[in-house]
UniProtKB/Swiss-Prot annotation:
GO terms for molecular function: ATP binding; ATP hydrolysis activity; ATP-dependent protein folding chaperone; unfolded protein binding. Belongs to the heat shock protein 70 family. InterPro entries: ATPase_NBD, Heat_shock_70_CS, HscA_NBD, HSP70_C_sf, HSP70_peptide-bd_sf, Hsp_70_fam, ISC_FeS_clus_asmbl_HscA. This is Chaperone protein HscA homolog. The lineage of its organism: Bacteria, Pseudomonadati, Pseudomonadota, Gammaproteobacteria, Pasteurellales. PANTHER family: HEAT SHOCK PROTEIN 70KDA (PTHR19375). It comes from Histophilus somni (strain 129Pt). PROSITE patterns: HSP70_1, HSP70_2, HSP70_3.
Length: 616
């Protein structure tokens, strides 16, 4: 019933539908995008069923190619094929040229000293190139999820400084992607493993990617992560393992590559051998018309020096945190190179515990980011994860029918402010009661009441015309301020409350557990209540319209409308949400002609007495 239906300003007629949000692992070598679907986090695959999107951008005069196809052009046109742009983002031109003197790119500096790459498409910044990768990931996600994204959580290394973080945000903005939050990569990995679900202690995240090695030491306390120290080696990664294998192959075969294309082919062979040795004790290699064989033990000997380098970085990082390996509760493995059995073995010996490897190390960061994104957009998690964060339980407001609308979801980092607009339910309504609630259940009766106050002085209008903006603001001390403002007059009312006051951790956990145990029945109750509220709203609107314009209908038409009204009123008393929905549809059909005539009447009244030359 388009003419008579009322929706809150800025919202659709279905304000409680699932919002689409993703987690993005914007990696040096590869990037991934993940989302929570049917209650669990999963990485989204491209049309060829591939998880990893190479972080490679190829530029021509008239198009931008991202991913696998761009990678194929790297050896043919290295200057216009940008690889590992993450190394460049947020750095000065001087810094880039000093750190990476062998890059095949030509640089120019801006007035601020930031690097610009000279390409066929002109001068481009690392931010612009990163934006192309994010556009690719966004398009993939929207295609797979079937809708427009609300936003994304993008992961960054824990050691990224403000300039690098802001540059990442700028790249997302350029890509048309809303950043819900930048999340440290080690924190994302820990979330994916559920280490935020009540454990206490210190964890290490060992991240051996394609181009870099990072180690982070985190303290976990009641779901809150504190980064104690970060370290690593920006010149150590899985690519170095490939180069060592390539050197071994050349030495054994006595055949060296003669050009860039042969070098690239050799590296690809080495990479395939490395991957195969993770599950095989020995591998035959066909190279330069020769058949070679390498065992896993030989491979381990080749890479042992690099693995020791990574463990030295771990030792230095532990020292920075005033800790020893025995202080570490868990070790999370991240990055494709941590699949190598020798790496896992050495890391386990160093930290004196078995590393966590059950989640694909290529996926783990993206999966954790997706979980966080799902929380930040206010989707109710279906999993049984108890994540006790700074805001331990969601903060919401009572809406019609005794429903709870979440304003700030649990796990949100403070300080934070969120606002939402509401409207009146009845014609002439001049006051609104604001009921502040805490909890994860769908109904007011199942949540904790924090405060009530009344906003008075709302101008008398038809239902749905007034716009009341309700703002929830939590400061660094956990103090919640709630303010309601009627936008046309500026009249306002507010209250303050300490949401965590009087709640123990056990009580919080019990509230979360209760929400999970009753999730199915809560959703059913919510759906039924929403349909009843919608039906009541429509019925009141139709009765109001009949009082004003009943004369627009003949007796048969009026009888049909009243019969549909009576039928819907009876259905509201039932427990069948689908039947109520059908009843609303039947009333909609019965009132379509009535709505059209009312519109015509309003137009005639508006034009009455005006000359046609005055109407534009």
């Amino acid at each position: 019933m388009a003419l008579l239906q009322i929706a809150e300003p800025g919202q659709s007629a279905a304000p409680h539908q699932h919002k689409l949000a993703v987690g993005i692992d914007l990696g040096t070598t590869n990037s991934l995008v993940a989302a929570v679907r049917s209650g669990s986090s999963e990485v989204l695959r491209d049309e060829q069923d591939r998880l990893l999107i190479p972080s490679i951008v190829h530029l021509t005069e008239d198009q931008v190619i991202v991913g696998y196809e761009a990678g194929k052009l790297a050896s043919q046109d290295p200057q216009n094929t940008i690889i590992s742009v993450k190394r460049l983002i947020g750095r000065s031109c001087t810094d880039v040229q000093q750190r990476y003197p062998n890059l095949p790119y030509q640089f120019s500096a801006t007035e601020n000293g930031l690097p610009l790459l000279k390409t066929r498409r002109g001068l481009l910044s690392p931010v612009e190139i990163s934006a192309e990768i994010l556009k690719k990931l966004t398009a993939l996600a929207e295609q797979r999820l079937g809708g427009e994204l609300t936003g994304a959580v993008i992961t960054v290394p824990a050691y990224f400084d403000d300039a690098q973080r802001q540059s990442t945000k700028d790249a997302a903005k350029l890509a048309g992607l809303k950043v819900l939050r930048l999340l440290n990569e080690p924190t994302a990995a820990a979330i994916a493993y559920g280490l935020d679900s009540g454990q206490e202690g210190v964890i290490a995240v060992y991240d051996l990617g394609g181009g870099t090695f990072d180690v982070s030491i985190l303290r976990l306390s009641k779901g809150v992560f504190e980064v104690l120290a970060t370290g690593g080696d920006t010149a150590l990664g899985g690519d170095d393992f490939d180069h060592l294998l390539a050197e071994w192959i050349v030495k054994k075969s006595t055949v060296a590559p003669q050009n860039d294309r042969e070098k690239r082919q050799l590296i690809e062979v080495a990479n395939q051998v490395k991957v195969a040795l993770t599950t095989n004790d020995k591998i035959r290699i066909s190279y330069a018309e020769q058949n070679l064989e390498i065992t896993r033990d030989e491979f381990n000997s080749l890479i042992s020096g690099l693995v020791k380098r990574s463990l030295l970085a771990c030792r230095r990082t532990l020292k920075d945190a005033n800790l020893t390996p025995s202080d570490i509760l868990e070790v999370v493995m991240v990055g494709g190179s941590t699949r190598i059995p020798y790496v896992r073995e050495q890391v386990g010996e160093f930290f004196q515990c078995t590393p966590l490897t059950s989640i694909d190390p290529d996926k783990v960061v993206a999966l954790g980011a997706a979980i966080q994104a799902d929380i930040l957009v206010g989707n109710k998690p279906d999993s049984e994860m108890l994540l006790l964060d700074v805001i331990p339980l969601s903060l919401g407001i009572e809406t019609m029918g005794g429903l709870v609308e979440k304003i700030i979801p649990r796990n949100t980092t403070i300080p934070v402010a969120r606002a939402q607009e509401f409207t009146t339910f009845k014609d002439g309504q001049t006051a609104m009661s604001v009921h502040v609630l805490q909890g994860e259940r769908e109904m007011v009766t199942d949540c904790r009441s924090l405060a009530r106050f009344t906003l008075r002085g709302i101008p008398a209008m038809v239902a749905g015309a007034a716009r009341i903006r309700v703002t929830y603001q939590v400061d660094a001390d956990g103090l919640l301020s709630v303010t309601a403002v009627e936008k046309s007059t500026g009249v306002q009312a507010s209250t303050q409350v300490k949401p965590s006051y009087g709640l123990t951790d056990d009580e919080i956990a019990n509230m979360l557990k209760s929400s999970m145990e009753h999730a199915k029945e809560d959703i059913q109750t919510r759906l039924l209540t929403e349909q009843r509220v919608d039906a009541t709203r429509v019925i009141e609107s139709v009765y109001s319209a009949l009082q004003q314009d009943e004369d627009l209908l003949d007796d048969n038409e009026l009888s049909a409308v009243k019969n549909a009204l009576v039928s819907l009123q009876k259905l509201i008393q039932e427990e069948d949400s689908l039947a109520i929905k059908q009843g609303i549809k039947m009333l909609d059909q019965a009132t379509q002609e009535f709505a059209s005539r009312r519109m015509d009447k309003s137009i005639r009244r508006a034009l009455s007495g005006q000359h046609i030359e005055h109407i534009k």
